[in-house]
């Protein structure tokens, strides 16, 4: 059991974020939740509280530095410290030809996937440095696309490759302050975003094919495992994917 450990999960109203928040609550963590939509966050908070754990719902656009600063101030007032950040909030762009992407579509993905991860990590690092005892852990949600792209996915793929660089930089810079940072790269979790895998998605050879998926609860369990290690140990990179999905040899 985590005991008096405090976690923050972004994008916690749905999908992977919700699954991670619930898994952490079951493991004894007190969990703060960030997301843009109040009602899904409140629903996740109620489920965590039903487990006997404390939950704090904070409506916030992770791409807005003012909103992120306010969310971290509220978290510090309520919890007093932060032991884990799961940087999960993410967005994608339409699967259209590269030259047809608008700047607005590009920027919307960068704002959430990269800028949002940066801002939340920055807030977490600052708090982890000054709290007593100091230190904590950051887990960034990368993706299979941090290694190999899907067709017609340049904004998403670019941001997820960038997350790998962000993860390694935080892991290096955080060492002296007992801050560990790792990344989980997930392939085909069955969420609202991942449901399209069951209907058929473009492949590198031009085909449309159904792909295997994994239960999103398994991702939550993986986050709990990464979070349960002592700060002297770090899973820098974990890949969790459907065994039979096309990744190795994706093309």
Which ranges hold each PLM region?
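C-terminal helical subdomain
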Residues: 183-184, 203-248
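Conserved glycine-rich cofactor-binding loop
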Residues: 13-15
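Active-site helix of classical SDR
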Residues: 121, 159
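Substrate-binding pocket helix/loop in short-chain dehydrogenase/reductase
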Residues: 96-98, 105-107
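Conserved glycine-rich Rossmann-like NAD(P)H-binding loop of the short-chain dehydrogenase/reductase
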Residues: 29-43
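The beta1-alpha1 cofactor-binding region of Rossmann-like NAD(H)/NADP(H)-dependent oxidoreductases
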Residues: 39, 59-71, 103
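Residue(s) in the substrate-gating loop at a strand-loop-helix junction
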Residues: 143
């Amino acid at each position: 059991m985590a005991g008096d450990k405090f976690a923050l999960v972004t994008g916690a109203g749905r999908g992977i974020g919700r699954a991670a928040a619930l898994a952490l609550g079951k493991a004894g963590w007190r969990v703060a939740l960030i997301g843009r939509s109040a009602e899904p966050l409140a629903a996740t908070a109620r489920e965590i509280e039903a487990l006997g754990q404390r939950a704090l719902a904070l409506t916030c656009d992770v791409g807005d530095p003012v909103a992120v600063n306010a969310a971290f101030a509220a978290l510090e007032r309520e919890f007093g410290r932060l032991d884990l950040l799961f940087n999960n909030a993410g967005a994608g762009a339409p699967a259209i030809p590269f030259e047809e992407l608008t700047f607005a579509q590009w920027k919307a993905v960068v704002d959430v996937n990269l800028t949002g991860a940066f801002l939340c990590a920055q807030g977490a690092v600052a708090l982890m440095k000054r709290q007593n005892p100091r230190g904590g852990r950051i887990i960034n949600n990368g993706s299979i696309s941090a290694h190999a792209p899907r067709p017609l996915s340049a904004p998403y793929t670019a941001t997820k490759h960038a997350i790998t660089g962000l993860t390694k930089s935080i892991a290096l810079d955080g060492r002296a302050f007992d801050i560990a940072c790792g990344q989980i790269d997930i392939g085909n979790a069955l969420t609202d975003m991942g449901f399209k895998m069951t209907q058929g998605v473009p492949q590198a050879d031009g085909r449309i094919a159904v792909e295997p998926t994994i239960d999103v609860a398994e991702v939550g369990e993986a986050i709990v495992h990464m979070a349960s290690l002592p700060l002297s140990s770090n899973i820098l990179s974990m890949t969790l994917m459907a065994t039979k999905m096309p990744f190795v040899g994706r093309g």
